[in-house]
Amino acid sequence: MKEPLTIAFEMPRHGWLPVRFKAAPVDLEFAASDVLNDPLDELYKSIQRLLNNKTGQVTWWLEPYTYFFYFERTGADGFRLTISEAPDMDAGRKPLAVLDGSYKQLIAPMRKALLEFCDFSYEKTNWPFSYTRADIETIPKRL
């Protein structure tokens, strides 16, 4: 990766989570819904799965548009993030980008964004995320 990946979550409101994601050539800004799934829960679990050499997927549902982040491990410190989109959950996916990088380049920014999200003070009716800062800190800073 030539440019660093950045991802940030903003304060959720009424079941919508504003997300900013940038990793060349992809630059996304969207609000994900919590109606069908909790994408932050999926992100946390995907990272845990990667640490155990398994794949993971995050579905960002925009009602009806959808982004998919598919994670896989490609080596001891190699990771791949495949980003695709679809007009709705059940439609065929169109690939947007395949990003290859190290833990520091691809996974650490996701961990950081989850930690920052844990610092928000909001009513749980606005978003169902149930992990604490201590839970997220179990994800290593580096491999």
Predicted feature descriptions by range:
Residues 1-37:
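N-terminal "first-domain core" detector
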Residues 37-45, 78-80, 104-109:
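Short, surface-exposed linear segments at secondary-structure transitions and domain or protein termini
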Residues 90-143:
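Mixed-charge, glycine-accented linear interaction segment located at domain edges/termini
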Residues 32-68:
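Short, well-structured hydrophobic secondary-structure segments
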Residues 12-17, 52-55, 75-77:
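A short, compositionally biased
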Residues 71-99:
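Mid-chain, well-packed structural core segment of small domains
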Residues 5-9, 65-73:
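Broad, structure-driven detector of short, well-ordered beta-strand segments within folded domains
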Residues 21-25, 60-62, 85-87:
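Short acidic, glycine-rich loop/turn motifs
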